[in-house]
Amino acid sequence: MRNIKIELADKDRLRIAGVMSGTSLDGVDVAIVDVTDAGVVVKAFDTVPYPGPTRKELLRLCSGNSVDVADIAGLNVILGEIIAGAVIAVAGGAKISLKSIDLIGSHGQTIYHDPGGRRFRGRQVGFTMQIGEASVIAQRTGITTISDFRPADLAVGGEGAPLVPYADFFLFGRSGTCRAIQNIGGIANVTYLPGNGKIEEVLAFDTGPGNMVIDEIVRRMSNGRKSFDRDGRIAGSNQVDQGLFDELMKEAYFAKRPPKSTGRELFGAEYVDRLVAMAGGMGLGYEVMAATATAVTAESIAGAYRKFLPSLPQEMIVCGGGAHNRTLIDMLRERLDPMRIEPMDHFGIDCDSKEAVSFAILAYATAKGLASNVPSATGANKPVILGKIVPA
């Protein structure tokens, strides 16, 4: 029998397909990356959209409402097939042989995340669940797959999130410059890199909503014809309503101290239902709601920097879909002047590929037997190796 751990650990360079599907539920991001201890080279990246029915099923599973366990089990398998197909498609499109790929690092799709937990049979239990069956991915592609990265951090008292700080430090933390890596996906999260090269001083947490609330408002406004505010045009051509803004900024999550993480459970469809009802009572239209929600994302990020970071960074490097929202970026620049704010593209990594690249780096760490949670970010009581290895 092959000793996969030794086989992988002995290679200086690993070619890894990092796979991410985030809270926006847009589709499967695949980045094929050559990783060494010195850094990464991205060989291919693309997003494979979810089929419409699959996205609807995922939205239903992520709603927080009760669902049939058979639906979870079935979609776990189907999503494994979709992820495998996405890896095969992206590799084929880039003319990369599957045999040249050493590993797949798959985050899967989060359908529930409650690190604070609840009382369950007399115990306080924190939990997280990502689906996208790794055994299916490994068998369809013929590539050893690492998945289920979050539970190990929860098992040692952490939030199970954010996990990207290890990758942020790996990519950007050894420059000597104090930086913030600001991801704006469905949820917005920040990694604070102190500039002194010490990973134990890295901080990271979810600041609040990223694109999630804006996207849902735009979907409702357009009756599903649009899924996001392209370039921030809707927000940029409408006024922020101060009354609605003030009410939304009262959200308790914004004042909670890190470590903290959040998701669709807090800022999903039910949150938007309440926002729409509140705005309707004020006589406001969807366009003003979109502008105000954009301002809430900007202020929740800027406010978190002012309240929770040891010092204001010299640079903010922005990634995720929100990096394309010009209105949102302008709002951040206004609030955080004179901080330099630039998209990650300026540093050689596609804004949209960053999280998929991050899970390639996390898979690399696991293959090398390295702990890759950051306790100062997640609140864990010790560093641990993340993920489960499924041989092909």
Where are these regions (language model features)?
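Short beta-strand-loop/turn "lid" adjacent to the catalytic site in phosphate-handling enzymes
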Residues: V69-I131
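Glycine-rich phosphate-binding/hydrolytic loop that grips phosphoryl groups
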Residues: L25, A291, A295, D345-A392
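Glycine-rich beta-strand-to-loop/alpha-helix junction loops that act as flexible
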Residues: S21, S106-Q109, I184-G186, E315-A323, ...
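A contiguous, well-structured pocket-lining segment that forms one wall/lid of small-molecule binding clefts
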Residues: G224-E315, R326-M339
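N-terminal phosphate-binding or glycine-rich loops at protein starts, especially the Walker A/P-loop
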Residues: R2-P49
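Conserved phosphate-binding catalytic cores of ATP/NTP-utilizing and phosphoryl-transfer enzymes
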Residues: M1-D12, T110-D114, F120, V125, ...
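Conserved beta-strand elements of the Class I
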Residues: R15-A17, C178-Q182, I317
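Glycine-rich phosphate-binding loop plus the immediately following alpha-helix
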Residues: D26-V33, F45-R60, Q139-G173, A180-A255
